[in-house]
Amino acid sequence: MNASINALILSALFVFTQQCGKENISKNPEGLDQIPECIQAKIAEIRQQEVWNPPAKVYRYQFRGQTVYFIPQRCCDFPSQLFTENCELICAPDGGFSGSGDNACPDFFNTRTDEKLLWEDKREG
């Protein structure tokens, strides 16, 4: 009986430790399969860094007839980034030294539609 209880406790501890620290990157009900792998890789990159201020987020929008992924600027002089589904950089809509991004898509904030927050870094800074 004692051996059975010990085995049960060890099994429970094993399962718990295997799940500890794992995070479902996507906070949306659609799941991870709705986020392109290259965007998932960018999220993984961000998670390896210090917590941003403000915390990092990834949004999905429709812009100029395509699905795009927006990572807002992390602070002051850092530009935001707007990517295609293949992680090709479209532009930096804002941020950077001028605060205006790279001026390659000045219409982004006025014409984007279908905003969906896909991920937000919930780590404590």
Regions found by a protein language model. Name each.
Residues 2-10:
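Sec-dependent signal peptide recognition
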Residues 16-19:
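C-terminal motif of bacterial Sec signal peptides marking the signal peptidase cleavage site
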Residues 21-23:
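Bacterial signal peptide processing site
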Residues 28-52:
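Short, non-transmembrane alpha-helical segments in secretory-pathway proteins
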Residues 56-75, 80-81:
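Exposed beta-strand-loop-beta-strand "reactive/processing" segments of non-cytosolic proteins
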Residues 79-83, 101-103:
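A short, polar/charged loop-to-alpha-helix boundary motif
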Residues 95-125:
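C-terminal partner/receptor-binding element of secreted or periplasmic proteins
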